[in-house]
């Protein structure tokens, strides 16, 4: 179980390998990845609870062709996801980078589910 430090703890020296700023979904995912590599990790969050932009979106994570979607027989594809993103930004985004993000979010979601037992549901 990780230790939770309050502001009073910062009067002491803390020796860590990795500092993650922000305790939202991205920050916590970064912390898990660093921990998986055997690093000691400190997550610094300014709020009194973990939050971030994913919390503002009700915890929704857009992705396509994830294991969770396949298990729930959700018909979606990376091509549909790509078309949705490009239509939303009126084809202004760099298509290469959009495709890379789509590939990486699918891998990240599957990694969180398989390696860290994250339960995902379809809304």
Which ranges hold each PLM region?
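Aromatic pocket-lining residues of Rossmann-like dinucleotide-binding sites
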Residues: 34
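Beta1/beta-strand and adjacent pyrophosphate-binding region of the FAD-binding site
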Residues: 10-24
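Conserved N-terminal/central alpha/beta ligand/cofactor-binding core
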Residues: 2-10, 40, 46-121
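Residues that mark the start of a beta-strand
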Residues: 17, 38-40
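N-terminal Rossmann-fold NAD(P) dinucleotide-binding loop
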Residues: 27
């Amino acid at each position: 179980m990780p230790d939770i430090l309050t502001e009073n703890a910062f009067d002491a020296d803390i020796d860590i390998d990795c500092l993650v700023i922000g305790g939202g979904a991205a920050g916590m995912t970064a912390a898990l990845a660093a921990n998986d590599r055997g690093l000691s990790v400190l997550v610094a969050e300014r709020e009194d609870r973990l939050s971030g932009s994913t919390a503002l979106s009700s915890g929704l994570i857009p992705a396509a062709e994830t294991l969770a979607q396949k298990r729930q027989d959700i018909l979606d594809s990376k091509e549909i996801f790509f078309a949705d993103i490009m239509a939303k930004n009126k084809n202004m985004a760099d298509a290469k980078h959009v495709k890379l993000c789509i590939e990486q979010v699918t891998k990240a979601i599957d990694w969180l589910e398989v390696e860290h037992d994250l339960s995902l549901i379809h809304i």
